Amino acid sequence: NLYSNPEFIPSKDDIKSVDANAILSYLSESHKYYLKERLPHIESHLKRIIEACPARFGNTINRFFNEYKDEVENHFKYEEEVVFPYIKSLCNNALTPNFSIREFESNHSNIEDKLNDLMNILIKYLPANIFPKERIEISLDIMEVTSDLSCHTLVEERVLVPFVEMMEG
């Protein structure tokens, strides 16, 4: 429902009926998809564009994207290595005393916003005559990934977090 209606807010009954393993599997697979498919695809467009533009613009774009990629990798790694195992242990009635989902909430960054920043950098710094078709393609790719990451975040924030809060009691 969140993909078709981002305004959807699940009821308590919806949250109670959550299949945590299915959600964790979906989130984990989407992490792999972003890291192995979507980000490399955007990066391949960027490399072609960067090669054709003046070094000062190319270096700015390249540095920003590499920092973004590192942030996304760290974000997903934290979820995969800390948050998801914690949730699995809760589902198996094994409470982990040094962590709570509130810690995740307070540290949960909005990684899709930086893609909007990348789009703004491309618009601001990239000379208009460099690969106009490529610019359109990368813009569409960035918008698509931004939208998808936004839905991904909604699943975490509106479904997974409330579910875990219920389990924590």
Predicted regions and their residues:
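Small-residue-biased structural context
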Residues: 1-169
